[in-house]
Curated annotation (Swiss-Prot):
Marked site positions, Stabilizes the basic form of H active site to accept a proton: 91
UniProt-annotated location(s): Cytoplasm
Protein name (record): Peptidyl-tRNA hydrolase
UniProt cross-references to InterPro entries, sorted A to Z: Pept_tRNA_hydro, Pept_tRNA_hydro_CS, Pept_tRNA_hydro_sf
HAMAP family: Pept_tRNA_hydro_bact
PROSITE patterns the record matches: PEPT_TRNA_HYDROL_1, PEPT_TRNA_HYDROL_2
Enzyme Commission numbers on file: 3.1.1.29
Enzyme class: hydrolase
Function as written in the Swiss-Prot or TrEMBL entry: Hydrolyzes ribosome-free peptidyl-tRNAs (with 1 or more amino acids incorporated), which drop off the ribosome during protein synthesis, or as a result of ribosome stalling.
Length: 187
């Protein structure tokens, strides 16, 4: 079983902002695999389903970004999911819009949501999918909580489909195969 987590902030104010790439990715995965994310629990919203024969839990923590680890660890503990089967999807300002990077482990790289997950799991060793949102052109907070331009939004729609394919590959063929196939791919 896999726990697929998309990071973001709850509420209409944050919908489709750069910082909510994880939520958008989870919604895209859910739509493709007919998984309803309508259950309340684990300090978030989640849904259970199947991706290519593998059981998955899709989770959107509603703790706000900086406390995401609380939600992740609750779900992981409840379902007894190993860290290697927790996939976290989130925005990355060091990657251009339209680029993704998959990692098996690593530091938080300044991302507060990841910092909190590392803290709660007591480990940096969980796979993640970083989705490029571009370098800030203004104040960091305003930038990540801002929406994409119309041109960027077109790329993001495409990248969300690629993220879905990457997660499918991670679940079925393993993280290393997904890294080989999707890292370096740019729209």
């Amino acid at each position: 079983m896999f726990l697929i987590v998309g990071l973001g902030n709850p509420g209409l104010k944050y919908e489709h902002t750069r910082h909510n790439m994880g939520f958008d990715a989870i919604e895209n995965i859910a739509a493709k695999h007919n998984i309803s994310i309508d259950k309340k629990g684990f300090k978030g919203l989640y849904g259970k389903g199947i991706i290519d024969g593998e059981k998955v839990i899709l989770l959107k923590p509603y703790t706000y970004m900086n406390l995401s680890g609380e939600s992740v660890v609750e779900a992981a503990n409840y379902y007894k999911i190993n860290k290697e089967n927790i996939v976290v999807i989130y925005d990355d300002i060091s990657l251009d819009v339209g680029k993704i990077r998959i990692r098996t482990k690593g530091s938080a790289g300044g991302h507060n949501g990841i910092k909190n997950i590392v803290l709660h799991l007591s480990s940096e060793e969980f796979p993640r999918v970083k989705v490029g949102v571009g370098e800030p052109t203004e104040n960091l907070v305003n930038y990540v909580l801002g929406k994409f331009s119309q041109d960027e939004r077109k790329k993001i729609e495409e990248v969300l489909n690629i993220v879905t394919e990457a997660v499918e590959c991670m679940v079925v063929d393993g993280v290393q195969n997904a890294m080989n196939k999707f890292n370096g791919l740019k729209l």
